[in-house]
Amino acid sequence: MPAARYQHLDDPFWTSLLALCAEAGSSICEHYNEPSLAGKLRAKADDSPLTRADLASHTILSRGLAALEPALPVLSEESDRSEIAGRRRWSRFWMVDPLDGTREFLERTGEFTINVALIDAQRAVAGVIYQPLERRAYYGALGAGARCYSWRESGGEGEAIRTSPLSASTLI
């Protein structure tokens, strides 16, 4: 994917990526609205929960990102070993947490997101943080700024987010 593509926040690339996150978010909300939330499948190796919502979002995002940019591999928190074999050699890839805040999801706090980042040379160069219940996305790219888009409040482009430049000595 040419850098110029994601560095223009009006590019159709962003429309596709935001729609993909919204689709994954809708799937998560279907599970969230189940009466029992009995969708917990098991605990992962780190003892964090894994739900049907995690897996549904993972599937939607993995397939969608592969269609959006076929040459880029996807590293997802829910990927199995075969999907991420050779990841140390990847210089450009998608990094995904299909449901960040699974415990909060299970507790119904509403405090969970979908996180998608484009990594290039070990650096995040573009990304989306999507809040499924709010139907709101924060997205941006290195050198292009950031925007917020709400499907509830907007009918057009995302609203620019004012940011301050980082100094060379800033630690994050």
Task: Give each language-model segment a name.
Residues 31, 104, 149:
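Residues that scaffold the ATP/ADP-binding catalytic core of kinase and kinase-like folds
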Residues 1-99:
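N-terminal subdomain of lithium-sensitive/metallo-dependent phosphomonoesterases centered on the IMPase/IPPase/PAP
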Residues 39, 48, 103-104, 110, ...:
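Flexible, active-site-adjacent loop/turn segments at secondary-structure boundaries
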Residues 62, 85, 105-108, 112, ...:
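Short, function-defining helix-loop hinge/capping sites that tune catalysis or transport
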Residues 90-134:
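Glycine-rich active-site/cofactor-binding loop and its immediate structural neighborhood
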Residues 116-172:
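Acidic beta-strand-loop-alpha-helix segment within the catalytic core
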Residues 67, 86, 110-113, 144:
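Residues in and immediately flanking transmembrane alpha helices
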